[in-house]
Amino acid sequence: MRKLGPVARAAEEAGYAKLIEPSGSDVEESLKQLHDPNYVEAFLSGIGPLASAPGWSWTPEIRDGVMAIQEGQLCAAKTAIEEGVAANVAQGFHHATYLRGGSFCTFNGLALVAQEYPEKTVFVLDCDEHGGNGTEDFIGRFDNLHQATLCGQVYGCRNRERSSVFHFASPITQNWTVYQDALIQSFGLIKDCHADLVIYQAGADPHIDDPLGTIGMTTEQMFERDKIVFEFLLGEKIPTMFVLAGGYQEPIKEKLVPLHLQTFACAQSALNGNSLLHPLQVRL
């Protein structure tokens, strides 16, 4: 979670976002409906091995940060539905299953939105390096939840009803059209299910220099990915929220923040009806 503060500040300073603090609404009961209540209680109390199931040593500060992220998820969803586009400066959702967290994901805030908006069709466009196995688990629990995951590492995901997997077994650096085609197919799925809200997992870990990445995107290709996504979604007037998802390059300020700022810049550009042409046009 170390990157969240630097990205939020940079997005605001560059004029790409207006920061809104979560309302402080109580999401505890919602999380106990979403996940096994025993797991939620273990994480909130910090007692027992389940408290560290996401993959880090439990601390009160981590707990409070995770809860703020979930509050932000619902705030961003509400804002996107009302205003067209919003972001939650957050990560750590798509590997969390009903029973427990894992791989640094504590609670599945993607599925949380589907739970809290049962009357809306929620589509997760997951463009992280890793497949959204936790979200796939919740698709079996929520009929209004759909997913397309474009990944280099599948994490056990497989094609099933309302969950499509586009796996890139080798780097796409020299074969960008393969990724573009997967995006276009995903857009078709979004239209076919008449999505009321799209949650875009705009991972930075597909980048060619990411220590956990295998997809091999260049900075320019990641920019093009974000541009294509927002121009389609906002052009179709589909309410859209995005989250940062993965990204693990160091140092954060020099390597990671610029990649995430591209996502904010492309969202703002599409919202205003403009078209950025190159990452160098992104204000840092």
Spans of features found by a protein language model:
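Metal-dependent C-N hydrolase catalytic cores
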Residues: 1-111
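Short helix-capping segments at alpha-helix termini
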Residues: 14-16, 233-237
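Well-ordered, non-membrane alpha-helical segments in soluble/globular domains
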Residues: 1-7, 220-226, 257
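Short, flexible active-site recognition loops that position polar ligands and cofactors
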Residues: 246-254
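Acidic/charged, solvent-exposed loop-and-adjacent secondary-structure segments enriched in E/D, K/R, S/T
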Residues: 270-284
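Short acidic/histidine-rich active-site segments
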Residues: 239-246
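Conserved beta-strand segments of alpha/beta enzyme cores
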Residues: 18-19, 144-146, 239
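Conserved alpha-helical scaffold segments that buttress catalytic/binding sites
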Residues: 74, 78, 87-235, 250, ...
